[in-house]
Amino acid sequence: MKFEVIKKDGNARRGILTTAHSVIQTPVFMPVGTVGAVKSLDAFDMSEILDAKIILANTYHMYLRPGSKVVREFGGLHGFSKFDRSFLTDSGGFQAFSLRSNTKNDDGGIKFKSHIDGSTHYFTPRSVLDTQYELGSDIMMILDDLVALPAEPKRIDLSIKRTIKWAKEAIDYHKFMQSKGVGLQQNIFGIVQGGTDYEARKFCAEALNEMPFDGLAIGGLSVGESNEAMYDTVEAVMPFMDELRPRYLMGVGTPEDLVENVERGVDMFDCVMPTRNARNGTLFTSFGKINIKSAKFINDHAPIDPQCQCYTCKRYSRGYLNHLFKARELTFFRLASLHNLHYYLNLMKEMREAIEVGEFAKFKRNFYAKRSTDEL
């Protein structure tokens, strides 16, 4: 993997990330394909219609069903899904956190019960990499110890100690496996934990900087803290994250979150929001969100967003989409998801262009000036 920052505007960075499967312009948003597919969309939609260069798949879900060994027999995620660009796989730590009534963390890893059949499993720093080797992702995330916020200082301290310990185990194991010819084209990212405790974040980031990770992520945010606390935490930890490596903010977020955190120096994002909101009838536009379920759109001949050049907006009206949603027609999920993902990917493109010409501050002012905070 190669990463190069080609332009800076304040702390905002414009870069190029190259993997074995694609050249990725950063800052980048990664659509979430939890089980190897972005909900309601296929590989053609992702590559030919949306031109996405990288998507995220989930180790926890692929491990449980169909199993990473099955995926390996199809040629990994690329052969299985037919999406021939880059995949990032997360470690499953967040799923263990979100299903924490069925999980128990200890110093060795995470014990959990399958949400599918109740069977018991144990993730360790090595086992999650073994699963990701079989999945064949371009970027693998290490196992980390995530805590809900707010958290007691004692629990945050335990979290960063475990995360650093697991990071060392993971990077040593990855080097060993590569010496055996495994995962030679796969890259590994460390994850900085620490809640909203700036000193804990600094300590964790500095420890991970000393390890030869290909990139660094900020984990454990957007889990209950305010937006301001998230932004302040990112701003506080960023000076302690290696400038030469890509920086990934996990599980974030709204369009506003993307703009605010690009301004603070983040290069990579993922979130289920654009596709989840699409399925629920909330569509993103340059002027804010619209609720396509509303009766006021029944006779509306306009596209979702007159300024949008997506597949859906060039072909279909708000009135038609309102009808499809109310009829629970499956076509709606695809058309709405294509629109929302186009909006997110185009937002990233606009930010890259603004950074290139040194006008990110102007872009941010215009972004907020034309947006309504209310659902329209």
Swiss-Prot record:
Residue positions binding Zn(2+): C308, C310, C313, H339
GO cellular component, one term: cytosol
EC number(s) given by UniProt: 2.4.2.29
Catalytic function, reaction form: 7-aminomethyl-7-carbaguanine + guanosine(34) in tRNA = 7-aminomethyl-7-carbaguanosine(34) in tRNA + guanine
Region (RNA binding): 251-257, 275-279
Domain of life of the native organism: Bacteria
Keywords associated with the record: Glycosyltransferase, Metal-binding, Queuosine biosynthesis, Transferase, tRNA processing, Zinc
BP term (GO), one: queuosine biosynthetic process
Binding of substrate, residues: D90, S91, G92, G93, F94, D144, Q193, G220
InterPro entries linked: ArchSynthase1/Queuine_TRR, TGT, TGT-like_sf, tRNA_ribo_trans-like
GO molecular function: metal ion binding; tRNA-guanosine(34) queuine transglycosylase activity
Disulfide bonds: none
Active site feature: D90, D270
Metabolic or biological pathway, per its Swiss-Prot or TrEMBL entry: tRNA modification; tRNA-queuosine biosynthesis
Reported cofactor(s): Zn(2+)
Role noted for this protein: Catalyzes the base-exchange of a guanine (G) residue with the queuine precursor 7-aminomethyl-7-deazaguanine (PreQ1) at position 34 (anticodon wobble position) in tRNAs with GU(N) anticodons (tRNA-Asp, -Asn, -His and -Tyr). Catalysis occurs through a double-displacement mechanism. The nucleophile active site attacks the C1' of nucleotide 34 to detach the guanine base from the RNA, forming a covalent enzyme-RNA intermediate. The proton acceptor active site deprotonates the incoming PreQ1, allowing a nucleophilic attack on the C1' of the ribose to form the product.
Self-association and partners: Homodimer. Within each dimer, one monomer is responsible for RNA recognition and catalysis, while the other monomer binds to the replacement base PreQ1.
Family per record: Belongs to the queuine tRNA-ribosyltransferase family.
Name of the molecule in the record: Queuine tRNA-ribosyltransferase
Organism of this sequence: Campylobacter concisus (strain 13826)
